[in-house]
Every structure is written in structure tokens, then in C-alpha cells.
Amino acid sequence: MSRYRGPKLRITRRLGDLPGLTQKKSKKTTRPGQHGKNLGEGKKKTTEYGIRLEEKQKLKFNYGISENQLYHYIKEARRRNGVTGLILLQLLEMRLDTICFSLGYAPTIAAARQLVNHGHIIVNDKVIDIPSFQCQIGDVIGIKSKSPAKKIIENNLKTINFSAPPAHLTFNKEKLEGVVQNYCDRSELLLDLNELLVIEYYSRR
């Protein structure tokens, strides 16, 4: 299944705020659809399956990943020792495109993915053009020398609501470099999500 490329505010009206998808807020007060409920009237889906599906969709749309990619991360999280839900989130947060977003290089994860795809981002002084690249503790993320995207990134850092990166990252404003200090803590996540419901959604696969 390919990534969603349709109206972003339509998705946030249905699922709530998704900081990785868009920073914009919809002025409409109803959910999408001809007979959409007001946003304050509760969720449209009331079955247990529907609630789990909605949480899964939040994860997919926020990080801009396909169904196959998400299932791959689920399997990898199950394989590792620890709390599966937290490991899943840490895998997604350690993606290079997510880290570029968290450092303030871009206003959305999709925009950060473009920076990576076009070869503007370096990890430990090497150009990495794979958005799903899994960063490791100690990795240094920066901008390629003489990259035309540097001015865009500098402008993004000034214009988007970026004050400081999450605690597992440090950022050098002079060098425009970030360092991965640790795995993310659950409390740092901006996304309103119940990851346990996502794990339950895939429990029979």
C-alpha cells in the first residue's frame, strides 16, 4: 500500500492532531463525510476493531509509512526484548526522516523525507538518502556541505514552532548538527496515541 497523498486536514479532522503530517489546523468542526459528526461528539467508530484501526491509522499517517512498512516495524518490535509498544515507537523515532523533523529541519516528516531523498542530509559525515535509515546512539546528523537546502533549513528553524529537540537529541545551532544521545522516552512523543491498541490490531497476524 502506497503512502497517502490526499488532503492532510481531512485526515486530522478524523484522527486528531498529527504533528508529523501537518502543523495546520482545520477550521471545520465536523468529521469528514456527508454526515460527519461534530468533533466533540466522540469517535465515529465504536467497535473495538474500529478503535484499534484508528490508532493504527494515526501511526501510519503521522510517520508517513505504508502498511507493509508498519507491519515490518511491528515484527521487528516483537522480535526485540522489552516493551513491544515502546520499542515500536523508538524504531519509528530513530528513522532518519523523523529525526530531521525532530531537529526542526522541516515542518513535517514528509518534508524531512524530501531533504533526505535529495541527498541534503549527512550522518557521521556520509550522505544518507534513505529516509527509513535507522540512526544509532552517537550518530551525528547534519547538512551536506554547500547544500542548496541549507537556507531552507535555516528558514524552517526560524519560522516553525521549534524551540528545542526532544531530550534524546541534542542540537548545535551554530553547526546545524544534531546528535542522537539516547532512545526516545514515551513521554517525549508529541503524538496522542495508544500504541498498545496498535499492537493488538496486529496480534492475529
UniProtKB/Swiss-Prot annotation:
Tell me yes or no: is Transit peptide among this UniProt entry's keywords.
no
The annotated region (Disordered) lies at 15-44
Which is a Gene Ontology cellular component entry for this protein? chloroplast
**InterPro entries referenced in this protein's UniProt entry, alphabetically:** Ribosomal_uS4, Ribosomal_uS4_bac-type, Ribosomal_uS4_CS, Ribosomal_uS4_N, S4_RNA-bd, S4_RNA-bd_sf
SUPFAM superfamilies according to UniProt: Alpha-L RNA-binding motif
Task: Tell me the CDD domains matching this sequence.
Answer: S4 (cd00165)
The alphabetized list of GO BP terms reads: ribosomal small subunit biogenesis; translation
Q: Which Pfam families match?
A: Ribosomal_S4, S4
Among SMART domains, the record links this protein to: Ribosomal_S4, S4
**Residues of the signal peptide:** none
List residues of the S4 RNA-binding domain: 94-158
Protein localization: Plastid, Chloroplast
Keywords carried by this UniProt record: Chloroplast, Plastid, Ribonucleoprotein, Ribosomal protein, RNA-binding, rRNA-binding
Assembly and interactions? Part of the 30S ribosomal subunit. Contacts protein S5. The interaction surface between S4 and S5 is involved in control of translational fidelity.
Protein family per UniProt: Belongs to the universal ribosomal protein uS4 family.
Supply the PANTHER family for this chain. Answer: 30S 40S RIBOSOMAL PROTEIN (PTHR11831), SMALL RIBOSOMAL SUBUNIT PROTEIN US4M (PTHR11831:SF4)
The name this protein carries in UniProt is Small ribosomal subunit protein uS4c
- Organism of origin: Thalassiosira pseudonana (Marine diatom)
Q: Which gene encodes it?
A: rps4
